[in-house]
Amino acid sequence: MVLPTVAIVGRPNVGKSTLFNRIAGERISIVEDVEGVTRDRIYATGEWLNRQFSLIDTGGIDDVDAPFMEQIKHQAQIAMEEADVIVFVVSGKEGVTDADEYVSKILYRTNTPVILAVNKVDNPEMRNDIYDFYSLGLGDPYPVSSVHGIGTGDVLDAIVENLPVEEAEENDDIIRFSLIGRPNVGKSSLINAILGEDRVIASPVAGTTRDAIDTHFTDADGQEFTMIDTAGMRKSGKIYENTEKYSVMRAMRAIDRSDVVLMVINAEEGIREYDKRIAGFAHEAGKGMIIVVNKWDTLDKDNHTVAKWEADIRDQFQFLTYAPIIFVSALTKQRLNKLPDLIKRISESQNKRIPSAVLNDVIMDAIAINPTPTDKGKRLKIFYATQVSVKPPTFVVFVNEEELMHFSYLRFLENQIRAAFTFEGTPIHLIARKRK
């Protein structure tokens, strides 16, 4: 399901991040603590009155060295381009400032609903001061104390009221994938090369994100795919569209909409911190993953080049041991014909279901190899396991005490399940739960 987007904008020190965390609440989830996964809290999922939405803190996108007014103009532009609802945060302690008026004039021109949140209204006496904010021309101001959680429910009510109508569920038979990576790694060239393959029949379709054009194609076997438009690559972009932080946000939106994510690395430049950050988002979102090294034709190679690259990738992306690596060239079309079949196999892994009886045989065999651990004289006891969902495959292991299930033993069980059932290109999640 594609989630609508809510963007938070405002000048520095008005409490955007605090409000962001308050709205997102516990839904900013960290699936596991894995070295090498760099997290960024500019993007999360919020939920209110049974409506989910993607939440963006545009302040986290800025270049802190940029001029002050340029930063807030940048935020407003991103919000107007990306969001279905904009939350404009101002400070009740400071009153209306020149910067607030500057942003309001930009936002006034948009057709996107704007909710004016007056933050730092920490006591009832301050509520009388919020009326000055009517001068911004953005409708009723909502008094909020994000530190204390006061008034955030009213803001959330307004957000949900202004969200677009929920879209129908998409066809599960269609495999949705996206190409993500730093600017200038060759994503656009790869897209054009893939769509130029003789084996595919492509047609553009209107995307569900703002102004996006996704591409639908069918391979020679009749499998339907939708290539998610990433970062507006297929439309003319703004100057700021090629900044890395901005492309992080766009990539995360594409990840949300994808079943399988192709992480594209430039062979000429190698692996960068950005690559690990984006791959971490896809991993934590439970998406299928392929690591695509593009521009392979530009390297001088010997018999050890592939092995060296694979070793470096496995070292840099230790949390992606399950992801296949493929070396391609958009220019020469080297190995591009292998991508559709690889995407299909990973989609099958994402949707694979294991019968409980077969799964528990593997669990019992694993315990025989490596007995369950003890803590303070008490031994972990595993009663049974069952698969509860797909995309990604998720298993619940019922135990006597959740606290006795150490992360390392859970990882051992995961490895045993992988050895038995493969699960190519997809993370799998194991959850320990106390049997009632």
UniProtKB/Swiss-Prot annotation:
A molecular-function term among this protein's GO annotations: ribosome binding
Binding site for GTP 2: 181-188, 229-233, 294-297
PROSITE patterns xref list: G_ENGA
Domain called EngA-type G: residue spans: 4-167, 175-351
InterPro entries for this protein: G_ENGA (IPR031166), GTP-bd (IPR006073), GTPase_Der (IPR016484), KH_dom-like (IPR032859), KH_dom-like_a/b (IPR015946), P-loop_NTPase (IPR027417), Small_GTP-bd (IPR005225)
Keywords: GTP-binding, Nucleotide-binding, Repeat, Ribosome biogenesis
Transmembrane helix keyword on record: no
Pfam families listed in its UniProt record: KH_dom-like (PF14714), MMR_HSR1 (PF01926)
Binding-site list for GTP 1: 10-17, 57-61, 119-122
KH-like domain ranges (all copies): 352-436
GO biological process, one term: ribosome biogenesis
Self-association and partners: Associates with the 50S ribosomal subunit.
Family as reported in the entry's similarity comment: Belongs to the TRAFAC class TrmE-Era-EngA-EngB-Septin-like GTPase superfamily. EngA (Der) GTPase family.
Function statement: GTPase that plays an essential role in the late steps of ribosome biogenesis.
Protein name according to UniProt: GTPase Der
Organism the protein comes from: Streptococcus pyogenes serotype M4 (strain MGAS10750)
Gene name as annotated: der
